[in-house]
Structure formats: structure tokens, C-alpha cells
Amino acid sequence: MSDLYAHRESDEYLLKPEHFAEKKNRPKRWDCLRPIIYTSLAFVGFIEILFFGIFFAQATRKTPERLLGELNGLVGNFPARRVIFRSDPLAASDHKTEESRNATMNNWLSYMPRGNGFIAVNQTERYTLPPPIKQLGQDTYSIAVFHQLHCLYAIMSVYDDLAAAKSAADLNAHHSRDDTHSNEHPHEQVHVHSHDHVDHCFQYLRQSLLCCGDTALEGQDPRTDNPGTDGTGAVHICKDFDGILAWADSRRLVDAKHN
């Protein structure tokens, strides 16, 4: 190859060879963006996996059963509230006068809704329930707390009768949830306060106390210096009873109520 040809060949380069070397060594824009893009895609993928994982967990998780609530969700959900146990002078009679007994009865009635806490439930076969109470042409059930109150009042009423030395005839005049009271309101019932009924109330209330399992801490009885407690002054975490009472009253079967 002649020197002239070699010179000519080199002159045909539009750019000097050094320019290509610089361009080859310069990092491309894609090389700079690649880590950012990969990181972003990985982050989006992680978020999607997390989202679907949470969604799947929520879809398959069973709703937790509310403490002391109704298993099937047929009764409203009532909030918990702090309640200080206080003495109520009308909670028990003086065991002497009819006036005092009537005042106590009315005091207890204030905790009972109209209809005594019986409600109607449709399509009972869809739920986990015991056989319904057939009354007023409907399938009905008793809300437990009002049955419990009724039982406790029944025991106290018998105690009043014994304390006042009532006759056996008078013992047959009290109302209960066990026997038919009238054709108009078959859910209102009359019962002779026999041993069977009182024994039932003792057992039922014991079961209710065991179910509630109240673990509030109770302190010294303020009425005496002797070691002991009457339960007053302790703070308990309770359901909103006013809410329960209003809920039951709004779904009553009849307007009458009794202890």
C-alpha cells in the first residue's frame, strides 16, 4: 500500500478515531435508568403480593365471636362501658310491707323491656339455634339477660314471701315464664313458685355467672372495718345495658311486661 493511498484512506474518516473511543466508553442513559426501573417493578410487585395476601386472609378468616354476644348475629352489637357498682336501696324490699315490695318490683321492672325480651326470628333453620318458642303464630326466642333477671327476681320474691310469712295461697299468685298466663299473651306465664322453679333459677343463674366470668377486682366493704367486700366501688367492663334494653323493646312482641 502506497503512502498516498494510506493518507487518502485516513482522510475518508468523517470523524477521528478518538471520537469513537470516547463514545464507546460513555455510559448509556439506559444503563443509568435500569436499576431504578427494576427497583420500581420489584416494589410494585411486592405491594401487589401483599395486597392479595391481605385480601385472601380477610376473605378466609372467620368473624370472631363476640364475647357474650349472640352466635348468629341476630342481636345487635352493643359497646362495652365502664360501670361502677353502687348500692341501690330499691333493689330489695324491707321484707315487711307491701309498699316496699311494690317499690322494689317497679325498680326491677325498669330493667325489663316491654314484651319481657322475647323476639321473633324468621327462617330459624338457617341459624344455630335451639327449637323456637311457638307463640303468637311466630317462632320466638328469649334474650338471655332478661331471663336471668326474671330468675333472680323470682328467687328474691320467694325470699320475701318466706320473710313475711306469706300463706301458701299467696305463693301461687306470682308470674313467671313457665306456665300459660292467658290466651291473649301465651308468652306471659303464671307459675307456682315450687322447688323446681327456684332450683331452676339457682342453676340457671350459676351458669350465667360462669359464662360471664367477670374478672373485675372488688375491694373492701365501705360499711364495715371487718375484712370483706360487698362489690360496691369496683369498676366493671359491662355491655351497654340501656342499648340492649332499647333494642329488645323495639322488637317486642307485645307491650305488656312483668318480672
UniProtKB/Swiss-Prot annotation:
The chain crosses the membrane at residues 36-56. Pathway: Mycotoxin biosynthesis. It is an enzyme of class 1 (oxidoreductase). A motif (HXXHC 2) lies at residues 197-201. It comes from the Eukaryota. GO terms for cellular component: membrane. Glycans are attached at residues 102, 122. It is a single-pass membrane protein. Its EC number is 1.-.-.-. InterPro entries: UstYa-like. A motif (HXXHC 1) lies at residues 147-151. Disruption phenotype: Decreases the production of ustiloxin B. It is found in: Membrane. One of its GO terms (biological process) is mycotoxin biosynthetic process. Keywords: Glycoprotein, Membrane, Oxidoreductase, Transmembrane, Transmembrane helix. One of its GO terms (molecular function) is oxidoreductase activity. The 2 HXXHC motifs are conserved in ustYa family proteins and might form active sites. Oxidase; part of the gene cluster that mediates the biosynthesis of the secondary metabolite ustiloxin B, an antimitotic tetrapeptide. First, ustA is processed by the subtilisin-like endoprotease Kex2 that is outside the ustiloxin B gene cluster, at the C-terminal side of Arg-Lys, after transfer to Golgi apparatus through the endoplasmic reticulum (ER). Cleavage by KEX2 generates 16 peptides YAIG-I to YAIG-XVI. Belongs to the ustYa family. This is Oxidase ustYb. It comes from Aspergillus flavus (strain ATCC 200026 / FGSC A1120 / IAM 13836 / NRRL 3357 / JCM 12722 / SRRC 167). The lineage of its organism: Eukaryota, Fungi, Dikarya, Ascomycota, Pezizomycotina.
